[in-house]
């Protein structure tokens, strides 16, 4: 089996369908004997350039190990699913399991926000005393 990195972008109006799509695609990979090394839902993000007059899309990243037949089936599903506006499947040499830079940046933003909120509540509590 070979390793692949799969990124697909979903129409922003169809964002509520993304969890079902992820479940369907991961189910197809695992039932065929493949493994999923990394799965990241990056959420809605600004596009670098408009695609079909859209300026945002919902991004999903998957790193999988699977047979070529499964990848061909996924590619066919992407092609005939109108909600998927772009996809990219790249073969990689090794399984990638660490967190991607996009997800790291998102985590850091959440950590900073939590720290700021804690500081605000501590300051508010100390000013009340």
UniProtKB/Swiss-Prot annotation:
GO terms for biological process: translation. GO terms for cellular component: cytosolic small ribosomal subunit. Pfam families: Ribosomal_S6. Residues 110-129 are annotated as: Disordered. It comes from the Bacteria. Coiled coil: none annotated. InterPro entries: Ribosomal_bS6, Ribosomal_bS6_sf, Ribosomal_S6_plastid/chlpt, Transl_elong_EF1B/ribsomal_bS6. Keywords: Ribonucleoprotein, Ribosomal protein, RNA-binding, rRNA-binding. GO terms for molecular function: small ribosomal subunit rRNA binding; structural constituent of ribosome. Residues 110-121 have a biased composition (Basic and acidic residues). Gene3D superfamilies: 3.30.70.60. Binds together with bS18 to 16S ribosomal RNA. Belongs to the bacterial ribosomal protein bS6 family. HAMAP family: Ribosomal_bS6. NCBIfam families: S6 (TIGR00166). This is Small ribosomal subunit protein bS6. The lineage of its organism: Bacteria, Pseudomonadati, Pseudomonadota, Gammaproteobacteria, Aeromonadales. The gene is rpsF.
